[in-house]
Amino acid sequence: ADTIVAVELDSYPNTDIGDPNYPHIGIDIKSIRSKSTARWNMQTGKVGTVHISYNSVAKRLSAVVSYTGSSSTTVSYDVDLNNVLPEWVRVGLSATTGLYKETNTILSWSFTSKLKTNSIADANSLHFTFNQFSQNPKDLILQGDATTDSDGNLELTKVSSSGDPQGNSVGRALFYAPVHIWEKSAVVASFDATFTFLIKSPDRDPADGITFFIANPDTSIPSGSGGRLLGLFPDAN
């Protein structure tokens, strides 16, 4: 099975797998059952921004979700990622819909990782920015239903030709290059990720959510990981 660390924007509460009974953001360490959650005042039809950061000195993974003109939601969890993730990983975005549906549109995505070692050469860093997405992206690995559209957006889950969200869809997008996320000699390993998103839904209960995730480089969509499992996990354990 894949080794996954994720920040979830969970639009549909699945209380049977430990979700709080409201939309929330959460931090997932190797399981869909979040280690830490915070209530998320999701606003359909508005562009939101997510900022995620990790610092190996503080050993804290944190995420902030905000919409222009309204208060932000923050969640954090103390974890030593050296003990969880392999040394090399890929970073990605995932989303699902189920019986209920929503658009899971990504408008922009950036990521920076840094490995500070005691040596003079501090070359172990990776940075990418997508302010828009090309139609045939060479620098993204698209999995499942994920596509890029003519407006320069990344649609993680299926939409109709008129832009309406489709149910029972799962899609992921990974940056093509593996990331050296930690090494034994590193003094500090840190990363920052930011993405902007737009969720629209005709349903009273949009579903299911979007994640930013980090996984082993050969990660793929697990069988049966749709809906509440957000395209990341094969089961709810």
From Swiss-Prot:
Subunit structure: Equilibrium between homodimer and homotetramer. Oligomerization is pH-dependent with homotetramers forming at pH 6.5 and above.
Subcellular location: Vacuole, Aleurone grain; Vacuole
Similarity section: Belongs to the leguminous lectin family.
Protein name (database record): Lectin alpha chain
GO terms for cellular component: aleurone grain; plant-type vacuole
Binding site for a carbohydrate: 12, 99-100, 228
Expression tissues: Seed.
PROSITE patterns (UniProt xref): LECTIN_LEGUME_ALPHA, LECTIN_LEGUME_BETA
Molecular function in Gene Ontology: carbohydrate binding; D-mannose binding; metal ion binding
Domain of life, source organism: Eukaryota
Transmembrane regions: none
Keywords: Calcium, Lectin, Manganese, Mannose-binding, Metal-binding, Vacuole
Originating species: Macropsychanthus bicolor (Dioclea rostrata)
